[in-house]
UniProtKB/Swiss-Prot annotation:
It holds the Pfam family Asp_DH_C. The lineage of its organism: Archaea, Methanobacteriati, Methanobacteriota, Methanomada group, Methanobacteria. It catalyses: L-aspartate + NADP(+) + H2O = oxaloacetate + NH4(+) + NADPH + H(+); L-aspartate + NAD(+) + H2O = oxaloacetate + NH4(+) + NADH + H(+). HAMAP family: NadX. The active site is at 208. The gene is nadX. Its EC number is 1.4.1.21. GO terms for biological process: NAD biosynthetic process. Pathway: Cofactor biosynthesis; NAD(+) biosynthesis; iminoaspartate from L-aspartate (dehydrogenase route): step 1/1. GO terms for molecular function: aspartate dehydrogenase activity; NAD binding; NADP binding; oxidoreductase activity, acting on the CH-NH2 group of donors, NAD or NADP as acceptor. This is L-aspartate dehydrogenase. The iminoaspartate product is unstable in aqueous solution and can decompose to oxaloacetate and ammonia.
Amino acid sequence: MILMMVGIVGCGAIANLITGFVRDGRVPVKLGFFYDRDLERAENLASMVDGRAVLDVADMLPEVDLVVEAASPEAVRDLVPEILEAGKDVVVMSVGALMDPELREMLVELASLNDATIHVPSGAIVGLDGLKAASMGNIESVKLITRKPPRSLGISMDEKKVLYRGRASEAVKKFPLNINVAAALSLACDRDVDVEIIADPAVDRNVHEVTVRGDFGEFKTITENVRCSVNPKTSVMAAYSAIKLLKSLSENIHIGT
């Protein structure tokens, strides 16, 4: 079997976990190229899998089949267009960037013109398959309540506090590195979902509670995520979702909507 050649943009917590799985033979892909603004971080990960750190994303594009963006919303705006123009598939982890309708439309058009695909993993929550299915009927409401330790939000406080209550489109602007979940929910059902963000010193995990109501009935999910040791803003589940997506691309049966 010819292995898919993969490059990574952004060598932080998610890239670390992906690289470890590939190194251990648990994901059948070739992880060949790494890009990060901090060259040393890229070199460290590349050394784990006999890969190559590059100084520019363009340097990997002639060789790869797919690129994993695991950097930032800015990387989605600045680098993903170049990847799609080269006809390469891309996995977008910084899904909050896709809440910008003009950017999203432009990227989808580039993908279409260049026979490429944009993959968005389910990230740090469960239930996106059910939400996508429910969106084929009439959805009445979708609400996300997120509780996080203050430290993971870069703040310090002794009491629980509601930091935000409103729509997902505004939440991703105020918390661009912390609320990709809200964006994933909105994109999955094509509506600006209701969001509440709570800083709670009593919790030590990132907790996401999703409630969906519609003509199908109702479902509710609660995900209590362990945070990555490398970056407490990132949930381990988010990395696992990207890893499973990469693995599924080489499989001949796909389970779930």
